[in-house]
Amino acid sequence: MNRIALGLHYDGAAFSGWQSQPHRNTVQDHLENAIERFAGVRLLTTVAGRTDTGVHALGQVIHLDTALEREPFSWVRGVNAFLPPSIALQWALPVDQGFHARFLAFERMYYYALYTGPHRVPLVHGRAGYQMLPPGQRLDVDAMREAAACLLGEHDFSAFRAAECQAKSPVKTMYDVTIRDDGNWVFLRFRASAFLHHMVRNLMGCLVAVGRGRYPAHWLAQVLAGRERKLAAPTFMPDGLYLVGVKYPDPYQIPAADPSASLFHGVFDDAA
């Protein structure tokens, strides 16, 4: 039996999240149907991170087991022929049976693209979050950065956890929160050992609230320490959220994600 790792991009705007559900339009169902048409047999996939409805991926990783003998690019070309335009494999890589897309991952990275201003921009609808601000007003990005500093390190992130979260522990390690602004755009990068359900979107709600001046920067540390979801801001919209990267031990040589063909082109190129 051969184990294959696959890299996947998708525009999540039209899908009910990653995970297969009866009578729902999910990324997993479309992918497994396409794989079946290519391989001639139903093959189950294991994913690095189950994204929610409306969330996108530039660096999703899956694995599957198969008896088929195919060249790596044959998987990419063949499966893509049966996928809708909003989903595409980027690479395929043979791996040993020790590889596991979910359990072997030691770091995950999400980006968020946020547009601010007095009116929405239809051309990025579904692909960027939006915060209405009066003409001439901007988010206080410096305050947002100050607030985000408390998130670094190992913490109990229960305050940012969805009620339906199935993670065994709320304790995660946040390695980095980088915030960049460019006119009406604000881009955020979150790197952590793993994320709880809705964790990034709940953090976004809090950071935007700080940026709007509704709370001081030190408020976020109080929310974190309180460990109660009711203390935090409402969950922010999924539209601008992208799973950009998943890291694995070096021997597996899993390709890094390439965000160049997205809203994030060049935004974090000089960030560590």
UniProtKB/Swiss-Prot annotation:
Keywords: Isomerase, tRNA processing. The keyword rRNA-binding does not apply. Its EC number is 5.4.99.12. Substrate binds at residue 110. Signal peptide: none annotated. It comes from the Bacteria. It catalyses: uridine(38/39/40) in tRNA = pseudouridine(38/39/40) in tRNA. Gene3D superfamilies: Pseudouridine synthase I, catalytic domain, C-terminal subdomain, Pseudouridine synthase I, catalytic domain, N-terminal subdomain. One of its GO terms (biological process) is tRNA pseudouridine synthesis. Belongs to the tRNA pseudouridine synthase TruA family. HAMAP family: TruA (MF_00171). Formation of pseudouridine at positions 38, 39 and 40 in the anticodon stem and loop of transfer RNAs. PANTHER family: PSEUDOURIDYLATE SYNTHASE, TRNA PSEUDOURIDINE SYNTHASE-LIKE 1. Homodimer. This is tRNA pseudouridine synthase A. It comes from Cupriavidus necator (strain ATCC 17699 / DSM 428 / KCTC 22496 / NCIMB 10442 / H16 / Stanier 337).
